[in-house]
Structure formats: C-alpha cells, structure tokens
A protein has these predicted regions:
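Short catalytic/metal-binding and nucleic-acid-binding patches
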Residues: 1-183
Length: 183
C-alpha cells in the first residue's frame, strides 16, 4: 500500500521518528544526532520549533521553508545519524538475520523504523498543544517526574523565552494535552 503525505503550505509539522524495535539509541548518541541535524540544515532550510529526544524516539515540530521537503529532511537526518553511529559503534545495527526478517515483514532495516509519524498543524492553538505534548513526553514515559529535569528537549529554551514557567507541567498545565496521544 502506498502512503501519501499531505503538504499544506506555510504549516508546521509534528514528526515522530522511532528507532527500529524501539532500541535505546538516541540519548547515548546525542552529539551524533545533533550533528545529523546540523548537516541536514546545510542542505535544507527549516526551523526546529520544538524538540524532545527520548531514548527510543524523537518528537519534533518542523517549520520547513518548503513544506514538500520535510520527508527529505527526515530522510537526511536518519541517513546522517545512521552513517555516523555505524562508524562509531556498529553494534547498534541489527544482525543480518534481524535485518532480513524486519525488512521482509515491515520493510524496516537499520536503526530506524521505516516510516515516521507526521501531523500537519493548522493553527496556533494546535501548535501550542503539540509543543506542550512534546515537552511533557519524558514525564509521560516515566523518565523524569518534572519536565524541567529532562535535558534533551527544547523546554529550557522555551523557559528562557518566557513561553513557560520553569515549573510548568503540573496537572492544570497539561489539561489540554491529556487527550493527545501520537505514539
């Protein structure tokens, strides 16, 4: 079955990239991931509005200059990260048998799930809800008790910019995102 992505000009896109078999690879290789994004920014024009890196998946909101390029942006990040992690630590790659089975059954291989989730954001309220969801994600998954304690997200930049109070994330703050579940 072919998958067709929707491209709405001048929009933001919430993207979730997951590792193959949800292996914990991103935090251990955070500098390689940062480099992958920097390398991709040399070839494509986009802004990362919000991001949260978890051990097995990444949430980000992109604002690409050309909305039709967000798939290429993600492909470039995945390629750069896979290449560099493979150079540093090839044991992150699956065995050849796992690759054959994964590719045959789900057309997946390497470090990432083949597809990524994407949702086009159409208004400011929705953008704010998605930003909140992304920043609350480490608490949702039980990695920390307070949003401010997770250092692998853009939350701290949002605090600096006065979007959030540094103690944001209590039950009243997250009321609007309770029904959002993108995973």
């Amino acid at each position: 079955m072919n998958y067709h992505r929707v491209y709405i000009p001048n929009s933001f896109v919430h993207i979730i990239i997951a590792s193959y078999e949800r292996k914990h690879i991103f935090i251990d290789n955070i500098e390689i991931l940062r480099t992958a994004f920097k390398n991709t920014m040399q070839n494509y024009k986009f802004e990362i509005v919000a991001i949260c890196v978890l051990p097995d998946h990444i949430h980000l909101i992109l604002n690409p200059e050309n909305i039709k390029e967000y798939s290429k942006i993600i492909s470039s990040v995945k390629h750069s990260f896979s290449h560099d992690v493979g150079q540093v630590c090839p044991t992150y790659f699956c065995s050849q048998d796992d690759l054959k089975i994964g590719y045959k059954n789900k057309r997946e291989k390497g470090l990432f799930q083949r597809r990524f989730y994407e949702h086009t954001i159409v208004n400011q309220e929705e953008l704010n809800n998605h930003i909140n969801y992304i920043h609350y994600n480490p608490v949702k998954h039980g990695y920390v008790k307070c949003v401010k304690d997770w250092k692998y997200s853009s939350f701290h930049k949002f605090v600096e910019d006065k979007f959030y109070d540094k103690n944001w994330g209590n039950p009243n703050d997250i009321e609007n995102i309770k029904n959002l579940d993108f995973e």
